[in-house]
């Protein structure tokens, strides 16, 4: 223990320099507590304010779909090229090495399969387990306009309330109700409702007409879903259009792991999201990286 006589009085207090208050600039997240902002800072690159998530949680309702037959062989080599991993707790514990050291968004809704009504989901993860697994956010579907709309919104509310107690962000993932058209009007409704319920991130689909209005009407960051597999050039164009119109990143799965050259595709997507490269430039990068 230090002797009282050994403690020297401080001298360099820089009294001419007031302490700076550094604002947290992620859209709509300035009033959150330190722990939640810290987790969001791991998801969204503080320099660019954007993120490239690698989604491989599809097995929770699709099983071993194409590209996800062996996570350890097909997906693990992609980890280092992603900003964030999105998966289930089962895959995280059984396949993802703890030394991977990537922020994780955990799938927190489920309890149904592709063989049944997908919107009939429940919360499938406790917040205690999310904290135990050192995740940076939890994610759940919200099915506006579906038969089980009410339950999916309740799931989101439950996760938001539990997350606020421990500083864990919640990401709402907009599923499409059977009778709803995938257009700006629908996604404006779905994203706004999810944000009003308190979610800190929204994952939704890009639409060609009016996407900038979806982003403007949503008070928290939007990341786009990759959706079904597209030709690489088209997928990069979708990324560029979304980022150009205000999206805060992408959460892509099939357009990465079902590509013939997934590492090259990851690098091309990173170029669009973090380096403002056009789709043409990113596609040139993809072609050069796949050699």
Curated annotation (Swiss-Prot):
<keyword id="KW-0704">Schiff base</keyword>
<comment type="function">
    <text>Involved in the degradation of phospho-AI-2, thereby terminating induction of the lsr operon and closing the AI-2 signaling cycle. Catalyzes the transfer of an acetyl moiety from 3-hydroxy-5-phosphonooxypentane-2,4-dione to CoA to form glycerone phosphate and acetyl-CoA.</text>
</comment>
<protein>
    <recommendedName>
        <fullName>3-hydroxy-5-phosphonooxypentane-2,4-dione thiolase</fullName>
        <ecNumber>2.3.1.245</ecNumber>
    </recommendedName>
</protein>
<dbReference type="Pfam" id="PF01791">
    <property type="entry name" value="DeoC"/>
</dbReference>
<keyword id="KW-0963">Cytoplasm</keyword>
<dbReference type="InterPro" id="IPR041720">
    <property type="entry name" value="FbaB-like"/>
</dbReference>
<feature type="active site" description="Schiff-base intermediate with substrate">
    <location>
        <position position="203"/>
    </location>
</feature>
<comment type="subunit">
    <text>Homodecamer.</text>
</comment>
<dbReference type="GO" id="GO:0005737">
    <property type="term" value="C:cytoplasm"/>
</dbReference>
<dbReference type="InterPro" id="IPR013785">
    <property type="entry name" value="Aldolase_TIM"/>
</dbReference>
<dbReference type="GO" id="GO:0016747">
    <property type="term" value="F:acyltransferase activity, transferring groups other than amino-acyl groups"/>
</dbReference>
<comment type="similarity">
    <text>Belongs to the DeoC/FbaB aldolase family.</text>
</comment>
<dbReference type="GO" id="GO:0004332">
    <property type="term" value="F:fructose-bisphosphate aldolase activity"/>
</dbReference>
<keyword id="KW-0808">Transferase</keyword>
<dbReference type="InterPro" id="IPR002915">
    <property type="entry name" value="DeoC/FbaB/LacD_aldolase"/>
</dbReference>
<dbReference type="InterPro" id="IPR050456">
    <property type="entry name" value="DeoC/FbaB_aldolase"/>
</dbReference>
<dbReference type="InterPro" id="IPR033673">
    <property type="entry name" value="LsrF"/>
</dbReference>
């Amino acid at each position: 223990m230090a002797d009282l006589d050994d403690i020297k009085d401080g001298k360099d207090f820089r009294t001419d320099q007031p302490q700076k208050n550094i604002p947290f600039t992620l859209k709509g997240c300035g009033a959150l507590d330190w722990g939640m902002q810290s987790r969001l800072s791991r998801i969204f690159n503080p320099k660019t304010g954007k993120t490239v998530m690698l989604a491989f949680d599809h097995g929770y309702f699709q099983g071993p779909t194409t590209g996800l037959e062996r996570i350890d062989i097909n997906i693990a080599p992609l980890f280092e090229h992603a900003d964030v991993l999105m998966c289930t707790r089962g895959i995280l514990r059984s396949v993802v090495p703890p030394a991977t050291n990537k922020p994780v968004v955990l799938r927190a809704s489920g309890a149904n399969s592709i063989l049944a009504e997908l919107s009939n989901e429940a919360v499938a993860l406790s917040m205690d387990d999310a904290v135990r697994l050192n995740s940076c956010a939890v994610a759940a579907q919200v099915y506006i306009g579906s038969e089980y709309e009410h339950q999916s919104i309740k799931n989101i509310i439950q996760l938001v309330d539990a997350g606020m107690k421990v500083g864990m962000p919640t990401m709402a993932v907009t599923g499409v109700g059977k009778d709803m058209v995938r257009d700006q009007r629908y996604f404006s409704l779905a994203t706004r409702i999810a944000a009003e319920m308190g979610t800190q991130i929204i994952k939704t689909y890009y639409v060609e007409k009016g996407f900038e209005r979806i982003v403007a009407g949503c008070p928290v960051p939007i990341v786009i879903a990759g959706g079904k597999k597209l030709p690489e050039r088209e997928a990069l164009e979708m990324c560029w259009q979304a980022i150009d119109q205000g999206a805060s990143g992408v959460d892509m799965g099939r357009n990465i792991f079902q590509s013939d050259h997934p590492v090259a595709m990851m690098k091309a997507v990173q170029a669009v999201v973090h380096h403002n490269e056009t789709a043409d430039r990113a596609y040139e990068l993809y072609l050069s990286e796949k050699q």
